[in-house]
């Protein structure tokens, strides 16, 4: 339990930030899921369209320290490779 007023305030700030970060993480995961579903169906056009929405979501999450920037780049790279395989 926080004793000082600054520690109590920090606890409140963390709680607010956690809610925002969870929301952004959920939004990011949903964007990734739509790309993966389109890839699973074999629908290249839908996958490309979903990827144009997904990539900025991942990069913004990395900028806001919700996920690591290397993790975001790795996810984008792997999804892009899967989409490229659909073209063949």
Curated annotation (Swiss-Prot):
GO terms for cellular component: cytosol; small ribosomal subunit. It comes from the Bacteria. GO terms for molecular function: small ribosomal subunit rRNA binding; structural constituent of ribosome. Binds directly to 16S ribosomal RNA. HAMAP family: Ribosomal_bS20. Belongs to the bacterial ribosomal protein bS20 family. This is Small ribosomal subunit protein bS20. It comes from Rhodopseudomonas palustris (strain BisA53).
